[in-house]
Amino acid sequence: MEKLTVYGELCVDEYGTEWNTEVELEDEQVRNIIKILMLNGGDTDVERMCLKDTFPDIYDVLDKACYKATLDAYNEYLMSCGKPEVDKLDFKHEVNLPYKFQDMF
């Protein structure tokens, strides 16, 4: 099992919060992601669209992991402000793939 780290940034104040989370993927799924990165030269928006269209099952796994990590990061932020936690996000989250894959090519 290969572990893939997905990352993002949560901008809720002037500082913003970075987070990352590890997702376990089959080796074949990781190879498919690398293939997409190679084909598209590292354009993040294109990666997201191609991944969503070409490998929707992998995209779904990453999307859920990113959603949970964003929700966790947002709740940490709310707690630090003394505000109550929420159980769902009312703003957009994004699937961001790690640059380490892009650096390989």
Language model features with spans:
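A short beta-strand micro-motif
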Residues: L4-L10
